[in-house]
Amino acid sequence: MTVLSISVGGCVVTKQSGSKKSMDSEIILFDGKNLDNWQPTDFAGKGEIFIDKNGSLVLEMGAELSGLHWKGEALPTSNYEISLQAKRTMGSDFFCGLTFPYKETHATLILGGWGGSLIGISSLDDFDASENETGDAYIFEDNQWYDVRLKVTDSEFTVWIDGKSVIDCEVEGRRVGMRPGEIEMSVPLGICTFATTGVLKNIKLRKI
């Protein structure tokens, strides 16, 4: 099997020749070198965003939201997975608010919200992550990397943390949308924190 790496619009797309599924491809959304395909989101009171010496993306603590959103080529809106590693280094609220596309709308995966330990997806049937069935408590330690994977299909959202399934939610026929407010500026794909410093790396998308 031959592995080819092709640069497309600043993204690196890795394809395996001979694969049974030609749609299987991995898009490196953040390569640790530049943010050419990203734009800082104009949140009020936002913190600084930069790449540190280790090639990790740092979203520094702001008054409330700090983050950036995708401005590169169009990404799939269903049948894909996003994987990343994230950690909280300062603060007590969410260190990874991952806004992602779903068909004609968007939603946000929250890690560490509402005081630092809530996970969930905002919003389902107009209920945010603290109010719908995806909301749960998860203890995050500061300065510890967590492996995160989000799978989006037409019928289901699934989330794993460190290989363990923590959210498995049927969404077909339901109202999927974003919590009203500034976070709506994170579309089509965005990452943000709330009054917290978050560090991320190895951000990838894979079509399924």
Give, region by region, the residue ranges found by the protein language model.
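Bacterial N-terminal signal peptides
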Residues: 1-7
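Carbohydrate-interacting regions of secretory-pathway proteins
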Residues: 11-208
